[in-house]
Amino acid sequence: MATDVDVQFFSHLNGLVLSNNWGDLIRLLDTCLVNGLPLTAITSATIDAQGDITLNLYAEHKALLFQVIELQGFVPASINGKYRIKGTPDSKTLILKAELKGQAITTTGTAKLASLGYEIIFRDPNDVKRVYRTKNPTVEHPFIRVDESLTSPDDTSGVYTSSYAKYAMVGLLENMTHIDDYENPEVLQLPFDSTDPAKNWKITGTGTNVIRGWNRWYWRKRGERNPGEQYADSDSINTNGSGQFTLIGDQNAFYFLTNIHVNFPNRKIMMGCGLFDSIFDKSLIQNWFLGGVITQQTATSFYNTIYNSPNMTMLCGSSASGKFLVLKHDPANPLTDHTYANCDITGYRSGINDLHSNSLVAATSFPFGDDNGFLRGNLKHVCFSRKNPLYQQVTPIIAESSMYIYENLYNNPAAGDVMGGFYFYMGELE
């Protein structure tokens, strides 16, 4: 049985930058979802007696255990493809899990951290918008629109000040013919207001009264240390340094975790989108989910990004504030307003309570229901942590042959300064 190479992750530890600049999120998504991250030149490549590949690189690779490497331009051509990093003996050497026993490399090619497998369907001339979709879509795969615009289409009725908090407006659509094709009431969207299909993409008002978007993916904001702190998007933010982040997933779903306040590296929030494992027939209702900071606060409204309902941040805080978006289960009327999903794991204390502290990996799946009383299914990849591993940054773990990473999340107000977090399952290392 071959080693799984579908789920990939990226981190700031790879040398990627997420700073206080407009465009940083889109550039990061381009790299992680579409292009991948090239490694430095390969000085030698060999196949050992077990059939694994050893790469010696000209400079530091900054790659992490269990990331996926894509090889191109090698001879014989059978060498080209995707491989899991099995070992990192030093900063310039990688060992890739392969099944190439008895083969030899005659020509060395190039290597990169493989992308998650998406493509850019549309981009705008000003380079502030993207529409992504998986490279091999089925009818269930949505178009993923990411918009960092600061003004309304007329450039006057809505203007967001560039020094305010940095976030993109993000949503899912069933079909698109151009980058701003989001006003058709007959096309499914998430989030969706049937009386105002463009609601997620609107910028209205100016100055401190501006409202920009609805489902927001933040990457730089004056953040909170506890439930009692509240800040506005217009509040001054730390403009120095690069944020910490992890982006993990595959062609079906991915999650983006980052610390919106650069001074608090472990206080990450989670956003994400894609398909979930539904208990319902997908011909009746699309199995989409979308997580972010769901709010329509003005730029000067004080709120806590993580803990304050009705503002919601995916799986953070509580059953009230930790909701995410799914399409409403109404097969007779699919073009209806979205509903909210709730994790079925009690307490929203993933990675905080030591319920099974003796287990190397205490990971369970994430079943969830919705506000209308329906059980909906399970989230892909992400797992509830039933112990506090005390990791300080993204950490690869292997349990028998199962590969995981663990990442911190500041997810429960009752826990004070105790960091929670999630496991993410990446498949089997065979």
Features from the language model and the residues they span:
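Small/polar beta-strand repeat architecture
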Residues: 4-10, 16, 32-53, 76-249, ...
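Short coil-to-beta transition motif at edge beta-strands of beta-rich domains
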Residues: 56-76
